[in-house]
Amino acid sequence: MAYPANWIVSGGIVLSFAEYEDFLDTDKRVFEANEGLTETLIEDSATKATNRILAKIRTTAWWQTIFMRLASQNQITQTQTLSTPYVPLPSANNIQERQADFTDLCVYLTLYDYVYPMIADFNNVDSAEVQKIAVFRTKYNELFQELIDDGSWYDFSGDGTITDLERMPTRTNLVRVR
């Protein structure tokens, strides 16, 4: 499988959708002003963010539907629980399209959930870091929903090509609650 050069891969397993340079490209000033934000710290946080992204994908109706539709009976039986099938995490190795969007998704989640909370002054709601948390959270949520709605980036069979059966766009109806 071909992975983007900026994904962190070890032993053929994707660990992170982003590397340190991706964060510098997104918001270099935060790293210049905060010397404690080391490459190791950021890439470890990006690995955690990648795992959280995959866990969130697992909870979507899109992933549950595609798994139940395309999984073999053996795969379904192996993941069966007492009442419903347990849907496993999608494999980061099988993401074949929109890989740059997954890099952006990882960067946004890492910045708003790990990096900025370390340096933000939450006593001052007008601080730039607190506002950037909100900006990156919004970008993350919008891009995540766009990827799920697109539904055409995952190679379920792992054979290196995405077939028409594996492409499953969805439509999410957002409901306003008053």
Regions found by a protein language model. Name each.
Residues 103-116:
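Extended, hydrophobic/aromatic-rich amphipathic alpha-helical segments that build helical scaffolds
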Residues 124-145:
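Short secondary-structure subsegments characteristic of cysteine-rich extracellular domains
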